[in-house]
Every structure is written in structure tokens, then in C-alpha cells.
Amino acid sequence: MTEAALVEGQVKLRDGKKWKSRWLVLRKPSPVADCLLMLVYKDKSERIKGLRERSSLTLEDICGLEPGLPYEGLVHTLAIVCLSQAIMLGFDSHEAMCAWDARIRYALGEVHRFHVTVAPGTKLESGPATLHLCNDVLVLARDIPPAVTGQWKLSDLRRYGAVPSGFIFEGGTRCGYWAGVFFLSSAEGEQISFLFDCIVRGISPTKGPFGLRPVLPDPSPPGPSTVEERVAQEALETLQLEKRLSLLSHAGRPGSGGDDRSLSSSSSEASHLDVSASSRLTAWPEQSSSSASTSQEGPRPAAAQAAGEAMVGASRPPPKPLRPRQLQEVGRQSSSDSGIATGSHSSYSSSLSSYAGSSLDVWRATDELGSLLSLPAAGAPEPSLCTCLPGTVEYQVPTSLRAHYDTPRSLCLAPRDHSPPSQGSPGNSAARDSGGQTSAGCPSGWLGTRRRGLVMEAPQGSEATLPGPAPGEPWEAGGPHAGPPPAFFSACPVCGGLKVNPPP
């Protein structure tokens, strides 16, 4: 499977002693291939018609690129340097040559070249040369067309580094014939050492982030027809961009207008979901529509939230009233960058408003849901403790004594061998007196337990009766639910705060 062409266009190829103009296509056989496939057509029409290429050549072991070499009467040439050969491409303009060079370099990877001078005393021929670095391959080339005079792999080098006015490296035994120390005189020794460090560590210094392709130059010559086609293409792209922008603005207009409609709409959608869940737990299916209508009224989510929390339980302190949330207070910028956050806040407030609506339906079915009359006042102050300084101990007026402790059951129980006397007998009155004295020292709930114990422990042959209450004590004082417990707090007459009452 062949990939799309890396670069194609009109170039000049050397055929014997002449330059011939051909339509050349360069592509990779596969995305991971390290070679290039060169397809040669006579002209562009054969390429468009899908005819077979005139010739093809696979360029393997590519070591580098060298543009701008004057060769056989052409100044604008590009040499594709391989280990065994060099392909010379001629161009009519400098721009076309640079465009082909940039596109081929991008396809090959890390391709660099440096002009150096080989020092004498090594296996290499001394004199000027070109150092080519293509990925992990290092070669030295000279002459026109370029010919490789030495080759190394970066992984086979023992050491390398920049020295004053040059660069030095040493090839190990795995380099074979090219083992040894070599010194290259160059003013770019630091840059060469830096590139070696990056490539050895797997870093691409010239590549951008993954997935971002740089803008590569167009290799086609800027003729009149090409300029017209480019202008038409730019106009078409502009129209497509304007159309997309208009569609985006039309789709995002309700959410980016800056009003409360987007907030209320998102709240209504979320409240429908919350109400559908709450309607399955209650016995009033009409709460769905009523609570949804309450949540659709956007300016009152805070009051509904306060009412919903007040209905949950009386033990929870009422929360502070929240101000109505407007879009200006949220800091919403646009529908694209803050829509998610706005939607999450609105769904939270709508769920509370739907819960408040269902609670109002349960407790006040006759009131209209969401009406301001059925909701508590938003500015109600919270009760606070008394701040008055503690004075002298005030005299407490004695009231009816409330029992707090129980007496041992063995003292309260009647003997089993005696039958309970009648209500009019003196023994009964004594029992009433003892019961009144006992009730003065034990709580009312324990009195009920004591009397139930008397009934259970009575003889089987006798009739089980409860002992009568004291003359000054009513029957309700002995029941388990005698009345409301004593108030622990009272309003301070001075500051109006809550004041802790002392135990009776």
C-alpha cells in the first residue's frame, strides 16, 4: 500500500550529457520506511491520467541532502546523498529548490549538515568536506556530486564532544574500518555536540509537538495559472470558514446572549430529571409538572433552596438566604469556554428547587407552588445567644415538682401475700400518699413503668389494679406521654437572644 506523495513537481534530471525536464513524484513505500520511492513521468498529464510511470527508483540508505551545488550548468540543484550514490535534481528557481529540500527533510526526520575541515593524520583524506547527520547515521562527503568518504553510527561511537575551534569523536571497534579518533575543524562544534546529545537520547530538536505539522512551502512554480488557482482556493477557504463561523454563532446564540434564558433552560432540564426520580418515591404524581414549573422560574432558585432545606428536618439550622445568581456574578465569558461550569451550577440549583417544590406540595397542597407568599422570608435573622452579663442568681418561684429519680422497685412493690385493698380503705389512702411521695422524686415515664410492674407482679387470683395517684397529682402525670418537656431556652427580655434555663 503506497502513501500519498511527499512532494511532486516539474524538475530536471540528468540523462547522459543533457538535462531533461520530467514530472517527478517522491513518496514513501510505507509510513515507517526509511527510504524513498522516486517515480518519473514525462509530464503532468500522464500523472493526472493515471498512466504508468516511465521509470522508478528506490533511494535507500539516505545520508543527507545538499542543496545549491552548481553542477553541469545548473546553479539550483539538490543532491540526495546515499551511501552508494547521489541523485542530482535541477530546478528553475531557488524557491522551488528550497521547497523540495524542506519537504524531503521533514519526511526523513533529523537531517543536518555542517561544513567542516578534516585534520590530517587520520584515515580520512584531509581537506574541506561536508558532515551529514541523518537520524543516527553520520557521514563525511566531498566532491560534486557528493561521494561518501566515511560513515559511522552514533550508537557505535565511544565518545564525542566539542573542543576549541572544532569537534572530535572516536569510533569503537564496531565501526570496523572507521574506528579511531577523528578531529573536524569547525566553528559549529557546540551545535554539533548538542545535536549528538539530542539524537542519542531520542529527542528531536527540530520537530514540533506530536500531531502538529509545520507549514511547508509549495514546490510548484508561481505561474499565472497557479496564482489564479491559489486565489480561488483562498477565496473558497474563506467562504467555508465564514459559513462555519455563522453556523457556530447561530447555534451558540441562545447560550451566549448574556441573559437568564440559558440558565433557566438548563435548570428546567435538570429539574425534570430530579422530579422524575422524586415522583417515584412519593404518592403525588402531579408534583412533576408543578416542580418543573417552579424550577423554570429562573430568578428564584435561592428561595426555593432555602424552603427545601427547611422542610428536611427541624433539627437542622436554617441556612443563610442566597442571592439570586445572575450571569454577571458567575463570570461567564462565552458559551464555549464556560458552558460546562454554568450547566453544573444550574443543575445543582434546579435540583434543590425541584426538591423544595415537592416538599411544599406535601405540606401545603392548597398554596400555589413557587409563590412568594408560601415561601419563608429571605431576610429573616438567625436566633443568637444571649449576650447579657450574668448577674446575681435570681430567685426561682417554685412550681410543681417534676420527678427526676426513681426509688428502688423493692420499696415500691406491695407484698404478694396481701390482696390489694379497695379504693375507699385506709390502706389505699396510705398507698396513695406513698405514691404521691414517690412521684415527687421520679419521672413520669418511670412511674408508668412502676405501675405496669405492679400489675404484672400481682397474684393470679386477685384483680390487677393500678395504685391511685396522689390527691394533688393528675392521672396524666404518670403516663409515658404526660406533656411537652420543660423548655431549655427562653427569650431574654433585655437583648432578645436565647437564654439557657436552669434545670428545675
UniProtKB/Swiss-Prot annotation:
Record carries keyword S-adenosyl-L-methionine: no
Entry-linked SUPFAM superfamilies: PH domain-like
PROSITE patterns associated with the record: IRS_PTB, PH_DOMAIN
Gene Ontology molecular function terms on file: phosphatidylinositol binding; protein kinase binding; signaling adaptor activity
Written domain comment of the UniProt record: The PH domain mediated binding to phospholipids with phosphoinositol headgroups. Affinity is highest for phosphatidyl 3,4,5-trisphosphate, followed by phosphatidylinositol 3,4-bisphosphate and phosphatidylinositol 4,5-bisphosphate.
Tissue expression per record: Preferentially expressed in skeletal muscle and heart. Present in thigh muscle, diaphragm and heart but not in the liver or spleen (at protein level).
Residues covered by the PH domain: 4-109
Subunit structure: Homodimer. Forms a heterotetramer composed of 2 DOK7 and 2 MUSK molecules which facilitates MUSK trans-autophosphorylation on tyrosine residue and activation. Interacts (via IRS-type PTB domain) with MUSK (via cytoplasmic part); requires MUSK phosphorylation.
Outcome reported for the amino acid change (mutating residue 166 to R): In CMS10; results in a significant reduction of AChR clusters
Protein name per UniProt: Protein Dok-7
Result of changing residue 139 to L: In CMS10; results in a significant reduction of AChR clusters
Domain IRS-type PTB: 105-210
Region (Disordered): 210-229, 249-351, 411-483
Coiled coil: none
Lineage, top ranks: Eukaryota, Metazoa, Chordata, Craniata, Vertebrata
UniProt keyword list: Cell membrane, Congenital myasthenic syndrome, Disease variant, Lipid-binding, Membrane, Synapse
GO CC annotation: mitochondrion; neuromuscular junction; nucleoplasm; postsynaptic membrane
Outcome following mutation: residue 180 to A: In CMS10; results in a significant reduction of AChR clusters
Biased composition (Polar residues): 331-341
Membrane-topology annotation of the record: Peripheral membrane protein
Protein purpose: Probable muscle-intrinsic activator of MUSK that plays an essential role in neuromuscular synaptogenesis. Acts in aneural activation of MUSK and subsequent acetylcholine receptor (AchR) clustering in myotubes. Induces autophosphorylation of MUSK.
Effect on the protein of changing residue 3 to K: In CMS10; results in a significant reduction of AChR clusters
Keyword flag Transmembrane helix: no
